[in-house]
Structure formats: structure tokens, C-alpha cells
């Protein structure tokens, strides 16, 4: 599957060393202000070669919007976007054509397809997240500015909270504060002291020809209540499943996550108070109860494995000779992918939420200028069942 979403659908395409990568967004309502600059801002945050902790591959990642937008507004038709690859060097990959790299999808793609594009990981490469970020840029715009008469104002921000053994403690910050601090350093960590230690951890891995993993936290503020469905359509389940589709992600937590197994119920339960309607206060639930959003801020954590491309000798096999061999991976790779994966994780959360607000009726699926339900309208209607 190359498509995420039901009403708001994002289809991505392209390979790491192909001529281009792209995305098609289908189901975005008409009337949403959208420009190439809106998408470019997000792509620039993901772009390679932007700091000493990322791959030296230098790509401008200049987006072109080919359809679905006229005079600066969406048409309600498919939005097609493209980014051309400009700095492709496939020479380092010929030696591994028949030697699957440990930790990569080389061997599993061979099992499934037989004929594969082995250059840079092909379709399995992190490079393909360009399409996710393009789709996420449209989703973020929708969540922030729709509907036109009463925008939801949903803000989504991510930051790195762990690299290797270094864990951040940014304290209780708003989404705006997290963005401000995280975007001020190359690690995208909102804790300045931890950011310095993380840089050291990444540099040590690079010097050893190795890599290091980490954890990204994504927070969404102003998420309305009622998103998601019971049992198999749970919002937290959809978020976890979608985030697990990001290359290198190995685990997802919602709210307190695995820490909840160490807690008592009296400690874990977030209290409820009244503000014209019931409000759940706290992050243990992560913004979701029973698979449905309760109106509090949404909190998820994404655990990212170390980049598998390392120059440390590793054991593999040669598929032609059928002999066991030793391999050292060459090429241009990130010693830690977490800083550039932050906008990718944000984008996936945005796409899932954009789909959910359309399904819940908070945004009219035809046009952002048409009437849609508000939180207050929803509560006035539903409380009649008390």
C-alpha cells in the first residue's frame, strides 16, 4: 500500500535514486489557501545536507505543485506534487547489488519482488518520506486554517527527546515553545543542555563509522473531541499504525506509553473538569480514551532505530555465490536520522488527524467555506442524550 487515509488520502511514489519523488493528496476540500511555499517550508526541515548531523547528500528538494490548486486555493481535486532528485550517486551501491545489507529491506524486497531497485534502498529508503512531508504540509494547513469561518487551529510540533543514552527534559512547554527551542539547534531538541550531549553522542557514532537511534515526541494541540471510532477504528490505533509505516520506526507510544505498566490506576487516570463541556486534564491518556479523542492535547512518541547503513564490518551473504561474506556499507548516510525524521513524524500525525476531522464533520469535505460542526455545537446536540 502506498496510500494513507480514507477521506483525506495521501499517496506517495518514487525511489531513492529515481528521477523524482512525489505525492498526490486526494480529498482535500476546496478553498484552502495553499502555495508551494507552504510545502517548501516543511521540506526544508526534512532536507538532507542541512547540518553536520545529517547525510552529506545535497538535495534542494524544490517542490512543484502540478494540479489541484488555482489562484492560491485548493480546488477539491487531487493535488499532485513533485520533487526532482538532483544529487544521485549510485556508484557506491553496485558492490551490494547481490549482497543484502544487514538491517535494511534488501533481503525482504528480494523475497517479495525478486526484481528490485537496490540503489540507495529504492522504495524502502528514508528518502521516500519526501512524499509524506508534502502530504503532511497540506494536512497541517487544513488542520490549522479550516473551516474558514471558525478555524480549528490545530498545531502539531515534534522534537527529539532521546538520542542513544541521552534523554531530554524540556519541562512543561507549549507547542509554540517546543518549536522555538527545538528549531534552534541541529538535533531538534527542546532541551538545550541535552541537545549538546546529543550532538556529542551522534558525533562519536559518526567517528566510529556507526550510528545511533533515538526517540521523537509529537504533540498536537487544539485537537477536538470525538475523533476516532470504537474497537478497530481507534484514533490511537490509527496513529500507531500510520507512524509505524515510517522507515526506521520500531515502536510507538501514546501518552504515558510503556510507563503506564508501572503505574497505579489512581495515578494514571487523568482528572476531568468543566469548562462549558467536560475537559480531560493530563497527558497520561495522550489525548485519547476508548480510541476517541477527548479534546486534550495529543501526545505520541516514536522510537527510531539506528541508521542501518554503517561502515563497521558486518556479516551477510552473496546471493549469486551463495557464500557468507563480510560487508562494509559505503555511501552518504545519517549517523542519526531522528533530527530529520521530526517533520516526517509530524506529517503522519497531521495526515491521520486531517482524515479524522473530515470524517467527524469538523471540516466540510467539499469546501472549507461550507458550514461544519463546532465543538460547542457538538456538545449541545449530544448532551440531550443525558
Swiss-Prot record:
Query: Which enzyme class?
Result: lyase
Give the Gene Ontology MF terms in alphabetical order: chorismate synthase activity; FMN binding
Which is one Gene Ontology cellular component term of this protein? cytosol
Q: Which residues bind FMN?
A: 123-125, 290, 305-309, 332
Q: Which domain of life is it from?
A: Archaea
EC number(s) from the headed UniProt entry: 4.2.3.5
InterPro entries registered for this protein in UniProt: Chorismate_synth, Chorismate_synth_AroC_sf, Chorismate_synthase_CS
CDD domains from the entry? Chorismate_synthase
Q: Which Gene3D superfamilies match?
A: Chorismate synthase AroC
Query: What is the role of the protein in this entry?
Result: This reaction introduces a second double bond into the aromatic ring system.
The UniProt similarity line reads:
Belongs to the chorismate synthase family.
Q: What is this protein called?
A: Chorismate synthase
Q: Which organism is it from?
A: Methanopyrus kandleri (strain AV19 / DSM 6324 / JCM 9639 / NBRC 100938)
Classification lineage = Archaea, Methanobacteriati, Methanobacteriota, Methanomada group, Methanopyri
This protein's gene is called aroC
Amino acid at each position: 500500500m502506498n496510500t494513507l487515509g480514507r477521506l483525506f488520502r495521501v499517496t506517495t511514489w518514487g525511489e531513492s535514486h529515481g528521477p523524482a519523488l512525489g505525492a498526490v493528496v486526494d480529498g482535500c476540500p476546496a478553498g484552502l489557501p495553499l502555495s508551494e511555499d507552504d510545502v517548501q517550508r516543511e521540506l526544508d526541515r526534512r532536507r538532507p545536507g542541512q547540518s553536520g548531523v545529517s547525510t552529506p547528500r545535497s538535495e534542494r528538494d524544490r517542490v512543484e505543485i502540478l494540479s489541484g490548486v488555482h489562484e492560491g486555493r485548493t480546488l477539491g481535486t487531487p493535488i499532485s506534487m513533485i520533487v526532482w532528485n538532483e544529487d544521485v550517486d549510485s556508484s557506491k551501491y553496485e558492490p551490494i547489488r547481490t549482497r543484502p545489507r544487514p538491517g535494511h529491506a534488501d533481503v525482504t524486497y528480494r523475497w517479495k519482488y525478486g526484481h528490485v531497485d537496490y540503489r540507495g534502498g529504492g522504495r524502502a529508503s528514508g528518502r521516500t518520506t519526501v512524499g509524506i512531508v508534502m502530504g503532511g504540509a497540506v494536512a497541517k494547513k487544513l488542520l490549522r486554517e479550516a473551516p474558514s469561518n471558525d478555524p480549528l487551529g490545530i498545531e502539531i510540533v515534534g522534537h527529539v527527546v532521546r538520542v542513544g543514552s541521552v534523554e531530554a527534559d524540556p519541562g512543561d512547554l507549549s507547542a509554540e515553545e517546543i518549536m522555538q527551542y527545538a528549531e534552534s539547534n541541529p538535533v531538534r531538541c527542546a532541551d538545550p543542555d541535552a541537545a549538546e550531549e546529543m550532538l556529542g553522542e551522534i558525533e562519536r557514532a559518526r567517528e566510529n563509522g556507526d550510528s545511533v537511534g533515538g526517540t521523537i515526541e509529537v504533540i498536537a494541540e487544539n485537537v477536538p473531541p470525538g475523533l476516532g471510532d470504537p474497537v478497530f477504528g481507534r484514533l490511537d490505533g490509527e496513529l500507531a499504525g500510520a507512524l509505524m509505516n515510517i522507515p526506521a520506526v520500531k515502536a510507538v507510544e501514546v501518552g504515558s506509553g510503556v510507563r503506564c505498566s508501572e503505574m497505579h490506576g489512581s495515578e494514571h487516570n487523568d482528572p476531568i473538569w468543566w469548562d462549558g463541556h467536560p475537559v480531560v486534564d493530563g497527558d497520561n491518556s495522550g489525548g485519547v480514551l476508548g480510541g476517541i479523542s477527548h479534546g486534550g492535547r495529543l501526545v505520541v512518541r516514536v522510537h527510531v532505530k539506528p541508521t542501518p547503513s554503517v561502515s563497521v564490518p558486518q556479516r551477510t551473504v552473496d546471493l549469486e555465490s551463495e557464500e557468507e561474506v563480510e560487508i562494509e556499507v559505503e555511501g552518504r548516510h545519517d549517523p542519526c536520522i531522528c533530527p530529520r525524521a521530526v517533520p516526517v513524524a509530524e506529517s503522519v500525525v497531521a495526515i491521520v488527524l486531517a482524515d479524522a476531522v473530515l470524517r467527524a464533520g469538523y471540516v466540510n469535505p467539499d469546501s472549507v467555506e461550507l458550514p461544519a460542526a463546532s465543538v460547542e455545537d457538538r456538545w449541545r446536540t449530544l448532551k440531550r442524550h443525558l
